[in-house]
């Protein structure tokens, strides 16, 4: 079925969702004052790298600009300079702003506005990498070979200056017209080679239609539900964040920059991890592929099979949706105080608990993507596009609840509840009394299985709490200094805050989509729609169908055949309960 957009709008009030989930838009006055008066604690010790012509790539209108990039093709491969807003330099770790950020966990994007991690005066002004402004940054330098594999990498504190603010659509248009900004002229080739490297590692990338709620400019208070376009430029750009997160994880696990000898001291890390999928889940997916007539050679990985599918075939939607079930169990793993061993073992600790153990939040599938896209965005299947450095974690099966933050979670932002952040109940846990775990962490369970390597969140500190802490560890390791005590004290509370906020973000995001779907369809009960059956009924749950016009996904009564295009009838759409249902046959 052709996945297309159509303008369908209705009046939707998201205030009830804010109230239901306790999202307070106002920032405490004391914390706001701290943000207003924030100064760069490392102003006198920064490298001046304002000579690098950085650019930012973000959704139109975004002001919380975490990342600025410059990439060049060299005689030996590629050199990536990636500047990340240095939030740790402008927040007093013992002050009111740090305490409030610890409670919030991450920024919440709803269709009608944000609930920010930090006050806008900081996140959208003084700490944001806005064009033509000198800004403090954590500057990553990553030297890659011709295959875009990292050879040397490190991070330092620097002053940077962005030259231009770009968006994904314009970057794609410029790439198509062969007129890319010089600072990112090498991005397409670099991105393609990184994507290929990911497939070689066993990475899994999903391409599912992403529902977005956007404002209807022609009708006050009305909102539209559309399929969010995703460009190749999105994929290329997220590869930079993904690469940076992989380098960050290696620095934390090795205890040093890439060109230094691995440390034999304490291993301190905040990793984004995901366990490998069960073989039974892969076997089930192979049976589904066979039933749909999709050729899947026995020696071909899941990622390569998915990458080779026809994006417009109904079977692709079914398999991509089922693949979300392979990407479950994403969470944060804290290592603190372990002595790194030759086999990669080290002590881990659980979030919010004084006893040891790896942090693993059961939040389902995750992928990276920018949570600030043009509206509340939910990928069908609860998963954003995989691939990049920060995919927002998404969870669940088709139509299921999404989670936050992604393989990484990649960093495309949305202006409304889209793959984004959270307000949580506050920090929990602490370092006091922590004991080594009796189950040493292994190389396998320190990995992010969707990425095929260890990974960390370090590229979105204006919007996600974990990134500030992981970045500080990397800065200390590369400088050869001790990791600050406030960072070590905050690792477990931060992981716990992220776990809570991820869960809440998914619920809020799903609620915004459900409310919009049910409101748009409320006057169309009994109407007949063309649909693709993305999941058949199994006796314990109904079938699930995707409607392209308007783009909705919902349960279907009856037994429609999986992977087929059928006609279904809308039998229920209730904005009060935020539920919709279809029926088959009509």
Question: Across the structure, where does each feature detected by a protein language model lie?
Answer:
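Short, compositionally biased
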Residues: 582-586
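Long, intrinsically disordered low-complexity tandem-repeat segments
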Residues: 350-410, 416, 421-425
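Electropositive polyanion-binding surfaces
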Residues: 2-352, 391-392, 398, 407, ...
């Amino acid at each position: 079925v052709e996945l297309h957009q159509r303008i369908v709008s209705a009046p939707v009030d998201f205030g009830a969702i804010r109230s239901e989930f306790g999202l307070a838009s106002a920032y405490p006055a004391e914390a706001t004052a701290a943000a207003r008066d924030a100064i760069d604690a490392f102003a006198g010790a920064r490298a001046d790298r304002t000579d690098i012509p950085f650019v930012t790539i973000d959704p139109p209108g975004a002001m919380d600009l975490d990342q600025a990039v410059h990439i060049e093709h060299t005689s030996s491969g590629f050199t990536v300079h990636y500047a990340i807003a240095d939030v740790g330099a402008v927040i007093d770790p013992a002050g009111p702003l740090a305490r409030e950020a610890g409670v919030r966990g991450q920024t919440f994007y709803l269709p009608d506005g944000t609930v920010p991690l930090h006050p806008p005066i900081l996140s959208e002004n003084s700490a944001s990498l806005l064009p033509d402004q000198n800004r403090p940054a954590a500057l990553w330098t990553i030297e890659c070979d011709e295959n875009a594999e990292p050879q040397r990498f490190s991070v330092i504190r620097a002053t940077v200056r962005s030259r231009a603010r770009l968006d994904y659509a314009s970057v794609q248009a410029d790439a198509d017209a062969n007129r890319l900004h010089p600072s990112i002229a090498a991005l397409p080739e670099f991105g393609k080679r990184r994507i290929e490297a990911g497939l070689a590692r066993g990475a899994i990338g999903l391409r599912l239609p992403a529902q977005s709620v956007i404002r209807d400019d022609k009708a006050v208070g009305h909102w539209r539900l559309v399929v969010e376009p995703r460009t190749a430029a999105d994929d290329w750009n997220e590869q930079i964040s993904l690469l940076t997160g992989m380098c960050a994880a290696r620095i934390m696990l090795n205890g040093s920059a890439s060109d230094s000898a691995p440390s034999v001291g304490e291993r301190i890390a905040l990793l984004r991890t995901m366990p490998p999928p069960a073989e039974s889940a892969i076997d089930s997916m192979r049976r589904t592929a066979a039933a749909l007539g999709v050729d899947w050679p026995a020696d071909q990985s899941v990622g390569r099979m998915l990458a080779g599918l026809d994006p417009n075939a109904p079977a692709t939607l079914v398999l991509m949706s089922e693949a979300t079930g392979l990407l479950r169990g994403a969470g944060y793993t804290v290592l603190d105080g372990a002595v790194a061993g030759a086999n990669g073992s080290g002590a881990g600790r659980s979030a919010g608990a004084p006893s040891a153990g790896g942090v693993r939040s059961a939040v389902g599938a995750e992928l990276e993507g920018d949570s600030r896209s043009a509206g509340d965005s939910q990928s069908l299947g609860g998963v954003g596009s995989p691939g990049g450095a920060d995919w927002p974690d998404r969870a669940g099966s088709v139509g299921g609840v999404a989670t936050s933050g992604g393989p990484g979670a990649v960093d495309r932002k949305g202006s409304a509840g889209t793959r984004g952040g959270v307000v949580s109940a506050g920090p929990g846990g602490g370092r006091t009394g922590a004991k080594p775990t009796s189950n040493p962490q292994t190389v396998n369970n320190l990995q992010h299985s969707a990425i095929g390597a260890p990974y960390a969140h370090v590229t979105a500190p204006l919007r996600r709490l974990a990134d500030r802490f992981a970045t500080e560890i990397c800065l200390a390791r590369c400088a050869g200094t001790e990791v600050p005590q406030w960072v070590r004290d905050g690792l477990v509370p931060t992981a716990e805050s992220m776990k809570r906020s991820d869960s809440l973000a998914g619920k809020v995001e799903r609620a915004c989509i459900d409310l919009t779907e049910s409101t748009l369809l409320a006057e169309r009960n009994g109407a007949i729609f063309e649909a693709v059956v993305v999941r058949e009924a199994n006796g314990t749950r109904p079938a699930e169908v995707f409607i392209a016009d308007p783009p909705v996904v919902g349960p279907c009564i009856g037994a429609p055949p999986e992977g087929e295009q059928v006609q279904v009838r809308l039998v229920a759409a209730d904005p009060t309960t935020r539920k919709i249902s279809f029926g088959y046959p009509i």
